[in-house]
Swiss-Prot record:
Chain residue ranges for the region called Disordered: 1-71
Source organism of this protein record: Coprothermobacter proteolyticus (strain ATCC 35245 / DSM 5265 / OCM 4 / BT)
Name the record gives this protein: Protein GrpE
Assigned keywords, A-Z: Chaperone, Cytoplasm, Stress response
HAMAP family per UniProt: GrpE (MF_01151)
Phylogenetic lineage: Bacteria, Pseudomonadati, Coprothermobacterota, Coprothermobacteria, Coprothermobacterales
Length: 228
């Protein structure tokens, strides 16, 4: 082989090696993007799911915090309302006690007023009866004297009986009857006469009373046993 042929073959071999090297380099370059693509697919395939899961957890946590805050506010509101109701109840209870005390006081005052009115009415009635009785005493005395001289006069007896009935209606009753024991609280001593010791022998003038109030004592003669 001459030098010229050898040189051509070396050039061809070098060209073939260069072409082969270029192809291998191109192949390697095409494989690297594929690996990068796989990495992109791996990143794009796994990270969104993790991100979504993380976002869901964060949203759930935020919702829980929101619910807890709302619950706390609601509890605070309920506690405030409870305290307000307790204050209102305390005020109402105090007002109730004051009202009970007021009603009890009014009831007591009403009872006192009623009793005072009753006593006042009784006093007025008694004073009226006393005044009326004193006005009738002279008439009764006149009738009694007339009946001493004319005991058979039924007309006079009827008039006297009617007057006594009117007095009794107002609580006025006679005191001092023959045969009773002398009582200085109701009787006025005029003298002695022979008879049972300390007994009323004669009623000179009748006495009258209302209850325990003496309007006029009875004038009486009491008995005294003879010393002989």
């Amino acid at each position: 082989m001459d030098d010229k042929q050898k040189t051509n073959e070396e050039v061809k071999a070098s060209s073939f090696d260069s072409e082969k090297s270029s192809k291998n380099q191109a192949f390697e370059n095409t494989e690297e993007p594929a690996e990068g693509f796989q990495n992109v697919q791996h990143d794009n395939g796994s990270n969104p799911a993790q991100k979504q899961n993380s976002e869901a957890k964060e949203a759930s946590k935020d919702q829980t915090n929101t619910n807890n805050n709302e619950l706390s506010k609601k509890l605070e509101q309920l506690e405030t309302e409870r305290l307000t109701l307790q204050e209102k109840i305390a005020v109402l209870e105090q007002q109730h006690r004051e009202l009970e005390e007021f009603l009890l006081k009014m009831k007591h005052e009403f009872a006192l007023a009623k009793e005072a009115l009753k006593r006042d009415q009784e006093k007025k009635e008694r004073l009226l009866a006393e005044s009326m009785a004193r006005d009738l005493f002279p008439i009764l005395d006149t009738l009694d004297h007339a009946l001493e001289h004319d005991g058979e006069n039924n007309g006079l007896r009827l008039i006297r009986s009617q007057l006594v009935s009117v007095l009794e209606k107002y609580g006025v009753v006679e005191v001092g009857k023959e045969g009773e024991v002398f009582d200085p609280n109701w009787h006025e001593f005029l003298g002695y006469a022979e008879g049972p010791e300390n007994k009323i022998i004669k009623v000179v003038r009748k006495g009258y009373k209302i209850g325990d109030t003496l309007l006029r004592p009875a004038l009486v003669v009491i008995g005294k046993e003879s010393s002989c």
